[in-house]
Regions:
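Basic, helix-initiating cap at the start of DNA-binding domains
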Residues: 1-43, 58
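Short hydrophobic/aromatic patch on the recognition helix
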Residues: 43-53
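Tryptophan-centric aromatic hotspots in well-structured domains and transmembrane helices
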Residues: 52-54, 119, 123, 163-164, ...
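Alpha-helical DNA-contacting segments of helix-turn-helix folds
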Residues: 58-67
Length: 202
């Protein structure tokens, strides 16, 4: 569980602490990162960091989430196709800013159960919930059938393809690639009409 905060810091100060933590991650990697180092870099008391986040994994996960420009929970375009395209744009924007950092953290997470748990709690689960909410809104609007068997796999498909292309092809899943994936694989399974012609790209 995420530790309960016992004191308040301003959003501006919180962002400074997040940026300090991420800067140190980029410079030295996860294993070398310490709460003491973040405190020194941000000129903050170490006790404040522990009081706010409790552990290094929780701070790292919160920093990644807190510095994202677009949160999927805020996406609501009025249609499922629009929501999923916006989600794809947000995912590409977030991944593109710190590809090397995310790869390093992914590797560290599978060796550190506490970090993996924190990343799931702070990053993955909220995004899965947001995508599921998009699907639920689509059901309520009558865009897709409530018993459509593909509905439960939308989050896994969209999040999984981001990682899969890098592993299979050695290339990032950019916005154009994700849009083609949505049009060719996700929308047809959901019974949504593709809105653009899917072309073959290298």
């Amino acid at each position: 569980m995420t530790p309960q905060r016992r004191s308040k810091i301003t959003p501006e100060r919180e962002l400074e602490l997040y940026e300090a933590a991420l800067d140190l991650l980029r410079e030295s990697g996860y294993e070398a990162l310490t709460m003491e180092g973040v405190a020194a870099r941000s000129r903050c008391g170490k006790s404040t960091l522990y009081r706010q986040w409790g552990t290094k994994p929780q701070l790292v996960a919160a920093a990644l989430r807190g510095t994202r420009c677009v949160k999927l929970a805020d996406v609501d375009t009025g249609s499922l196709a629009g929501d999923l395209r916006a989600a794809a744009c947000a995912a590409v924007e977030g991944a593109g800013r710190d590809t090397a950092l995310m790869h390093a953290l992914s590797h560290a997470a599978f060796q550190n159960p506490e970090l993996l748990c924190a990343l799931r709690e702070n990053l993955i689960e909220p995004e899965v919930a947001a995508i599921n909410a998009m699907v639920e809104r689509a059901v309520a609007r009558g865009e897709i059938a409530p018993d459509n068997p593909a509905a439960e796999f939308v989050a896994a498909q969209l999040m999984g393809v981001m990682r899969a292309r890098q592993m299979v092809e050695g290339r990032q899943a950019d916005e154009a690639y994700l849009h083609r994936f949505l049009e060719a694989a996700v929308f047809p399974a959901l019974g949504l009409r593709a809105t653009s012609r899917v072309a073959s790209h290298p």
